[in-house]
Amino acid sequence: MDLQLKGKTALVTGSTSGIGKAIAASLIAEGAAVIINGRREEKVNETIRELEKETPDARLYPAAFDLGMAEGCGAIFQQYPDVDILVNNLGIFEPAEYFDIPDEEWLRFFEVNIMSGVRLTRRYAKRMIERKEGRVIFIASEAAVMPSQEMAHYSATKTTQLSLSRSLAELTEGTNVTVNTVMPGSTKTEGVETMLESLYPGENLTAAEAERRFMKENRPTSIIQRLIRPEEIAHFVAFLSSPLSSAINGSALRIDGGLVRSII
């Protein structure tokens, strides 16, 4: 299937690793030019080199900006003032006891997970609506609808993304702009793999054994009983970025392996 992304330009925030990097790779494979974003220039350039090895004719542009800060969002817009696709993937997570989370940490999570998307869509989505064409995608989490007691601050930001995305979608009436949210379940990113290694110290479990145990003990409602692979999310995001997905707007879409026990 041709997703008709040739000639399109996408900004994928937080795209030097994990889900963001996989999304960038999927868009590149479909012919889109992609702006690679991370905080460190060295890491951004390294990611571009890796992606170019996979797709030699890839069109990739570096954007080493901290989008968890207003200054970074302003700077990236100044360098790349127009995109066809905006994927708000940037996000942070960290387990923490609710009663021990200080105000500063709540504000940090809000700045990175919410305000980065607010600031970027304020600029890019406005231009998309003016020309009546574009795609905005927020990467949230199943925690948006199934909040976690060990990550209350993270869960709250993910729920907020659903509301923000739907509000923005309402502004696109009469255009070919769409705004949607994708809610992945637990995903096999570098950060999650590191977390699994720390969960069972001294038990000499293989990575596969640790994954199965984690899913059984911590994600018992998952139907697939495994971590989701970043590329599984990325392929779906590529479709949402495509003109072929024009009837999907204002939606919150789960890729969670059946983790959330709901038919809607």
Task: Identify the residue ranges that each predicted region occupies.
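Short C-terminal tail/terminal secondary-structure segment
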Residues: 6, 146, 237-238, 244, ...
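Conserved glycine-rich cofactor-binding loop
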Residues: 9, 16-17
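Substrate-binding pocket helix/loop in short-chain dehydrogenase/reductase
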Residues: 73, 97-98, 105-110, 218
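Active-site helix of classical SDR
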Residues: 121, 157, 165
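Alpha-helical segment proximal to the catalytic Tyr-Lys
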Residues: 126, 170-171, 246
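Residue(s) in the substrate-gating loop at a strand-loop-helix junction
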Residues: 141
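Short, small/polar-rich loop/turn modules that mediate ligand/substrate recognition or access, typified
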Residues: 173, 178, 248-250
